[in-house]
């Protein structure tokens, strides 16, 4: 039961806290470590998932520039 008490950080509440210009480190503090990231020419796309919920964030120069969410509760 203790494992179930650790709620996912992939929530609408946390998504709403993500602001343009936040650093990658600040974002990881808020959402936890991403499922994965891909990088091309200094642009990173990172993805956080939980069940049907997903947050994708694009970082340029280590700063949030674009955020997309699906299925958040």
Where are these regions (language model features)?
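Sec-dependent bacterial lipoprotein signal peptides
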Residues: 1-6
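Residues within mature, well-folded domains
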Residues: 7-73
């Amino acid at each position: 039961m203790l494992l179930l008490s650790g709620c996912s950080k992939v929530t609408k509440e946390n998504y709403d806290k993500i602001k343009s210009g936040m650093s990658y480190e600040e974002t990881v503090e808020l959402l936890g470590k991403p499922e994965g990231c891909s990088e091309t020419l200094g642009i990173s796309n990172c993805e956080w998932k939980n069940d049907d919920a997903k947050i994708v964030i694009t970082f340029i120069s280590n700063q949030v520039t674009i955020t997309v969410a699906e299925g958040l509760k």
